[in-house]
Amino acid sequence: LDTASPELYGPRMPRTELVENILKCFDFAVENLEDNDNSCGYINQDMALFLKSRFCLFEGTFRKYHTELNLGSTASKFLEMSRDAARLIMNKDRYHLFKNASGDAYWQLFVQKGTPELEGNEETILARVYDGVKLGHDNPRYWGMNNHTRYCMGAPVCMLEEYLCEDGRPIYIGGSEGNYEVNPLFKGYDGMWEELDNRDPRLKQTVCKPGEYASIFDMDDNTYGLEETGVIYPMITYATGGGSPMKHYNSTVTGYRFIKHWMPDYANWEANPKGVQTAHMFRYGELLLIYAEARAELGEITNEDLDITINALRERAGYDFAKYPNARLTLSNIPADPRLDAIYAQKLDYSVSPILREIRRERRVETMMEGMRYEDLMRWKAGKLFTVSVRGMKMTPEKIELYSKNRNDETYKDYPYKVTVPIGEVGNQVIVDAEGFIIPWPTSTTVINGVRPWDDKRYYYPIPLNEMLMNPELKQNPGWKDINR
């Protein structure tokens, strides 16, 4: 085809026809690519199987939940293909979850440099590797600075609340909104970042608790220098530029600074754009989640499936099954979660079984900050979850006092900028709600009081107007602007 080919100027191809052609491409690749375990060289059969499994899970669940397509009767076919492609890879016993002796394997996986084999990593199926000479990138700088030269990143409370406690139960184990029964392991929001304690071990390998990781990192020698630097508490800022100076670049919009992907290598930050942090494109951990979800959607999942998928991921993360046996997920011991169930009941137009709820939770937690959440919500027809209020940490009196320290005083030279926080009113840098939780982006005209807008038209991207001008046979997706109006 070339730009004048008539095939490019006809009406839209039906979704079913397009998808069948995509499947033919996958099957051709699987049949013709080499069957080896080279994760960063030529594309191989395992990579094609992985992509087929991921694609078929997307298409199967999209067809199941998007009833407007009238394709629900074909959803199972795609879920079965997703399941089977994943199982083919699993049966080769070629890939295994990355583990280490220090208990931080989940964090360590995402700060590797060089080929996965050199790092003792058998989890990565496809990686993008950089040498820093001919090929590099600037992500180490963005993660190291927490994107402080643009709008800063930050973890919201609604995200934190989805992480279980270390006993395998959520933070609220009974009751209803306004009268929840609290898990005894959950320390609540009234302390100094203590809500991160006693939780799924991946939480503190994703979000930095002051006193750990970036908050005590000495950029001069790439060591954790608590004695020299003290704890560098996160600066809370919304504005571009983030202020100056910003020692250790420890800024955030919510009070919770991300630590996943952050690597303690200042030289690599400054090597921009020649950073060498490995990019894991396909990994075995995601494949296990795909398999578990496909099996659950088909109504086939067993305790054995849970052990080789969800429970394997939890064990790698650091869950102590000997201390908390119920942290091991089984079909007969699925924890209650009144908070999440209430959100699903309010935001979704279908019910979610307890086991699917837990698998979706596991997927969100395990793949946090890997760019999958948006597409997951699209295929689950769960866009209204975007309207769950986004809030930052609770500004307790202790934190308000901490953030009011005068940085001109040598005693507090490494503390955050002075911040005054009249509860419920505009402070010097922080605005909080009636309960004292930070409202991110308080001047935004689209995110109002932490609530993001949603419109169902966003389940489908708009067709660019210039494409419709070139091809009048194309029709705009529902809800988006057409060339005729």
Set out the residue ranges of the language-model regions.
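Acidic/His metal-coordination segments adjacent to aromatic residues that form catalytic metal sites
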Residues: 3-14, 263-273
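An aromatic- and glycine-enriched ligand-binding surface/loop that stacks and positions planar moieties
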Residues: 19, 46, 56-240, 385-415
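Surface-exposed patches in mature extracellular/periplasmic domains of secreted proteins
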Residues: 35-41, 95-102, 322-324, 370-372
